[in-house]
Design a protein with these regions (language model features):
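A conserved hydrophobic secondary-structure block that centers on an alpha-helix together
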Residues: 63-70
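Extended non-globular scaffold/tether segments
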Residues: 39-50
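Conserved catalytic cores of very large enzyme subunits
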Residues: 1-40, 70-88, 92-349
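Amphipathic, well-ordered alpha-helical segments in soluble domains
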Residues: 25, 51-58, 123
Length: 349
């Protein structure tokens, strides 16, 4: 649930690079527990590679069966791309976005209740810039691919919320991070008006340029209810106040709905601890009526209500801790462990 898929790292290393890291750690593993951990990660990532390769094979078969020359060419190119990314790192924008989609799909198959493409415009921009400068990608084609990705995210196979963040600041130096791809992502949302991705636009007063604010307003005016606007001047200090390094805090994004995570750094989340505040108020009213209890003023009622809320929060917190401890003892997620920073390095699920 809320699996942090760390695309920022994945598009650089690819599936093959991830497997190389796992095998390297496996060769050096000393304890049986560590060997089992790395073996599990290797099995899963090999399965990921095989899964993508099966798509490549099926797409090639469809290409042979297709009479329309344009569609046959498209399917043939898709097959070539997927066969490559099944084992090698992506080198073009088309290859990178295909890898992102396949991993997002696999994340849903693994039971991801809420997933995110995180800071898509940041980790995809080097591929976009490279291809545009060399004339192997047009802006229109990039826009079409982004729109296609958005449409795929809205297919029934996707379990729940799929999110994406654009804009913000660079994690290295805190400078403005908005780029041409940030603009295209917003334009795609304005054109399609789809529920997903649940998009956020990050802004930093004094750093974010006027053109990005204008693009945000254009998207809002399109009537699609997107994007949510996140203020870096608020969120980054909030995160650093929790002890998170500023460089990491600058790399935050909205996971699923509005949950804030750090790209590549957070572990999976559990769903629980839901507190229905109106229901608590209603329960207090019914209890007061049943006991024929009255209050001198509203503040007295509010004080008792807040005590009830506090007790429920404590109970929810303890319940959440029990769930987390139970998961640690009974479950493991080698897929997420292969992608989240620190897991492979420390042989920790």
């Amino acid at each position: 649930n809320h699996t942090n898929l760390n695309y920022k790292h994945l598009v650089v290393t690819g599936i093959g690079g991830t497997l190389e890291r796992i095998n390297g750690y496996l060769e050096k593993a000393k304890s049986q527990k560590d060997k089992e951990f790395y073996t599990g990660c290797r099995i899963v990532m090999e399965a990921v590679s095989d899964y993508i390769f099966r798509y490549a094979k099926k797409t090639a078969e469809k290409a042979e069966q297709t009479e329309d020359p344009v569609r046959r060419s498209e399917l043939g190119q898709m097959a070539v791309v997927m066969e490559k990314i099944a084992t090698q790192k992506p080198e073009t924008f088309t290859e990178a976005i295909e890898l992102v989609w396949m991993i997002q799909l696999i994340g849903n198959l693994f039971g991801g209740s809420a997933l995110s493409l995180s800071r898509f415009d940041q980790y995809m921009f080097p591929f976009y810039k490279h291809d545009i400068e060399r004339g192997i990608l047009t802006v229109d084609r990039a826009f079409e691919l982004i729109c296609s990705l958005y449409l795929k995210l809205n297919e029934p196979k996707m379990r729940t919320v799929q999110s994406l963040a654009v804009g913000g600041v660079r994690c290295e130096n805190g400078e403005n991070a908005c780029n041409d791809l940030s603009k295209l992502c917003l334009e795609a949302m304005s054109a399609l008006k789809t529920p997903y991705p649940n998009m956020s636009a990050r802004v930093m007063p004094g750093k974010t340029q006027d053109w990005f604010y204008e693009e945000i307003m254009r998207t809002v005016k399109a009537g699609c209810g997107q994007p949510m606007i996140l203020n870096d001047a608020v969120w980054i200090p909030n995160l650093t106040s929790l002890g998170i390094p500023e460089k990491w805090a600058r790399d935050y994004y909205n996971m699923g709905c509005t949950e804030i995570m750090i790209q590549g750094k957070d572990c999976n989340w559990t769903t629980g601890g839901l507190i229905f505040f109106p229901q608590l108020c209603n329960a207090l009213v019914h209890m007061s009526v049943a006991k024929n209890k009255t209050y001198e003023n509203f503040d007295a009622f509010l004080n008792e209500y807040l005590q009830l809320v506090s007790a429920q929060c404590d109970e929810a917190g303890e319940s959440g801790k029990n769930v987390i401890h139970s998961q640690r003892e009974r479950n493991c997620d080698p897929f997420a462990s292969s992608l989240i920073d620190g897991c492979l390095e420390n042989a920790l699920d």
